[in-house]
Amino acid sequence: MEEIYAKFVSQKISKTRWRPVPSGSLQTTETFATGSWDNEENCVSLWSIGDFGNLDSDGGFEGDHQLLCDIRHHGDVMDLQFFDQERIVAASSTGCVTVFLHHPNNQTLSVNQQWPAAHYHTGPSSPSYSSAPCTGIVCDNPEIVTVGEDGRINLFRVDHKEAVRTIDNADSSTLHAVTFLRTPEIVTVNSIGQLKIWDFRQQGSEPCQILSLTGDRVPLHCVDRHPDQQHVVATGGQDGMLSIWDVRQGTMPVSLLKAHEAEMWEVHFHPSNPDHLFTCSEDGSLWHWDASTDAPEKSSLFHQGGRSSTFLSHSLSNQAGVHQSLVSSWLSTDPAKDRIEITSLLPSRTLSVNSLDVLGPCLVCGTDAEAIYVTRQLFS
């Protein structure tokens, strides 16, 4: 892999996202967005990856990511998603959801639309109204789904002032993240280790399926769906474990993979090469998981700068009887036969790596050490 380039940006980065390339386009992405948190003034920013430069004083490569534009954001940026080429949706710790519009002609961002009280607490234990953080968003034009600390799920449509659908008491605990399983189904993860599937075609406030971690009810912080096999879902939790789920069968994960030493903040399947998966953690690490069958001799060791530590996997379900070619490499991982290769992508441990995104050969991540890291050569 080409060197990973760092740029120090004087703000803690909570979210990083590549701008999608137009469908059918052969170009690689050039632009990414970031959101910040825990700063005196937070903002949403757009960057161009530009040229990569020289060695810095620490011996690392200094990236020449150019700031295109930024705009103030009220509250911490809890999540960030591109809605389309021009619009970015941001979730705030104030409970507000904002759509920002990028104007490429003069390189500015403006507020395009806003739902100021998408998430809020009510009831005897809170004032008659108090804001609740919006913790996660997912977009599928023209729809935006949001989840929050208030256990509420909202379905918004761009250009509609009010929510199209709200499930007020979707969860009695905090919802941490959401993604589409297949339209109009979504999957959410919560603070008591549950993965729930919701179908917007059904009325009422009950999920159509609940899966959960057995035992300790470890909070789940992140979720992603396999881009080709929509029944395969990955989650990461407070204990740093990576869980792989098959929502067609059972109520527990298919496999649990021992991973980070602290909270896993994000997990992403590579959108066009989903045998590759990426995770980042509070422990300051960013990992590339390779489950592809054509990888060289698989090793059960985790490689990082000459050090290795053992890698643990145990499968919780038997895949017998399922035609092997139809089984995702993530479901067929038998530790006795297959190995998943894990590579640490950052040159050294840092403060929390809060967010990552992958698109084509490009990866970006953001940290509490006020740095953004980028590589454009993931698989070389």
UniProtKB/Swiss-Prot annotation:
Which residues does the record list as N-acetylmethionine (modified residue)? Answer: M1
Subunit composition and interactions: Component of the Nup107-160 subcomplex of the nuclear pore complex (NPC). The Nup107-160 subcomplex includes NUP160, NUP133, NUP107, NUP98, NUP85, NUP43, NUP37, SEH1 and SEC13.
Give the record's keywords alphabetically: Acetylation, Cell cycle, Cell division, Centromere, Chromosome, Chromosome partition, Kinetochore, Mitosis, mRNA transport, Nuclear pore complex, Nucleus, Protein transport, Repeat, Translocation, Transport, WD repeat
Q: What does this protein do?
A: Component of the Nup107-160 subcomplex of the nuclear pore complex (NPC). The Nup107-160 subcomplex is required for the assembly of a functional NPC. The Nup107-160 subcomplex is also required for normal kinetochore microtubule attachment, mitotic progression and chromosome segregation.
Q: Which cellular component terms (GO) are annotated to the entry? A: cytosol; kinetochore; nuclear envelope; nuclear pore; nuclear pore outer ring; nuclear speck
* Protein name as annotated: Nucleoporin Nup43
A GO biological process held by the record: cell division
